[in-house]
Amino acid sequence: MKHILTILTALFVVLSASAKTPNNDLIFANINDANSPFYYPNLMLRYKEGKPMSEDEYHHLYYGYAFQPSYKPLEVNPSMNRVQEIMARISIDKPSVHDIDELIAAGIAAMEHDPFSPTLLNILVYAYGASGDKVRELAYSDHLNGILRCIEQSGDGLKEKSPMHIIMFSHGTDFIASKSIGYRKGQIMSRTVEFVPFDYPRNKVKGYYFDYSRVYWNKPDNYTFKRERTWQFNNLKPQEYK
C-alpha cells in the first residue's frame, strides 16, 4: 500500500481564477432542465459511477444538492458514526480485509446522507486503495479534488463579503484540514456567514469565511443545532497520481 499516512496535504492545485459564486436561480434552472448537460439525475448517476466530471459539473452537482429532497443537513448521519467507530479501531498500516470491507460499506451508506463530504471521500480513497481497487481509488480521489476545488472557487474566503460557499458545516472545516491547517472554534458573523480561525495565521491570513446559508433553508422552527468540531481527516493522505 503506497499511502503515506500523515496529515492530509491537498492534492489539487490552487487556482487563481476569479471566484465562481453560486447563482442559485441559474443552478436550479439548469439541474431541472432534462435537456441541460447539468440535469441533476444524470449528474448524480455519473458521480456515483465514478465518471470523470468537469468543474462546471461539480459546481452544479454540489450546490444543486441543496435543492434535492434528500438534502437534510441538520439530520444526524448514523452511518457516519459507524465510519468513525471503524476508523478508531482499524490498523491503518495493515488493515484486515474484514475491516476494509466494513469501512467501505459504512462509507457508502454515510454518503447517502452526505454524498460530498470531503472526509468520507478521503476515507473511501484510502479504503479502496487498501483493498487494491485502483479504479475506485482514483475515482474517489478525483471526486475529492473536484469538491474541494468547487468550494475554493466559490469565494476567496478572506472577507465576510466574499465567503466560500458550503452545503454542510463540516465541509468548511474539512476544506481547511485538507490544507494541513489547524483551526479553532468557528465564530458566527451573521445569519449566513461563519468565520473559522486558524490555529495560527498563515501568510497574514487568520482564517476563512464560509457561507452556510443553504444549511438553514428548510430548518424546522423549533430546531436548535449543536455542531461538533472534532471530526477531520483521520490523518490520511490519499494516493498521488502522476
Regions found by a protein language model. Name each.
Residues 99, 106-107, 140-143:
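Alpha-helical solenoid repeat scaffolds, predominantly canonical TPR units
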Residues 129-152:
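TPR/TPR-like (Sel1-like) alpha-helical repeat modules
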Residues 1-23:
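Bacterial Sec-dependent N-terminal signal peptides
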Residues 48-49, 108-114, 143-150:
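Solenoid-like repeat scaffolds
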Residues 20-100, 161-242:
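N-terminal alpha-helical interaction modules that lie
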Residues 118-119, 146-160:
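Boundary/linker segments of alpha-helical solenoid repeat arrays
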Residues 79-82, 121-124, 128:
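TPR repeat positional signature
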